[in-house]
Amino acid sequence: MVPEINMVIKNEYGQVIDHNIVEAHEWHLVAHYVKPHHQILELGARYGSASIACNKIINDKTKQVSIEPDPNVWAALEENKMVNECEFNIIKGAISKNKLKIHNHAYATYTEEGEGDIPVYDLWDLQNRFDVKFNAIVADCEGCLAELMNNYPEIFSQIELLIYEMDQPAICDYSKLTSILAANGLRCVEAGFHNVYVKQ
């Protein structure tokens, strides 16, 4: 049974969308696994249903940083945050040590290395800026976990929860990710397209 989290979500056209259909699986997993003490790095916030679910659960509402690279949904994300009375921090851009370009494919927007104008941020700078120590990651980001594996592998030593979609396997080596998670004491509790790992 999914814990009840009430929210109102609008898309980039100002239309109310059914969060029990759109992005439903992600926020349902959040509702089950995120704990009040978590300090959350969210990769791929989009309209914010998982963002809002996280923020309703955690004790310190400001200890959440939600990343979204697609400028088409930034205004909707900001509005949904406000309407649902949340306090998570929105970063309009991506975490990367390299320049990125964006590819828009409806819900499957993703980034890759290349000349582009997406603002990029350093992971450790974000931790310092918002005075957080991330111990949970929620990722619906079309393969962007590759960036963490390749450039910030140390992050996996401090997390105790990872929720992610296994999308864009051409971009992200998920077998490598599984090995990194196991080496850092995380075990799989849900597997498939949506995956959940927790610290043992």
Where are the predicted features?
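Phosphate/nucleotide-binding beta-alpha loop and adjacent structural elements of enzyme active sites
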Residues: 1-200
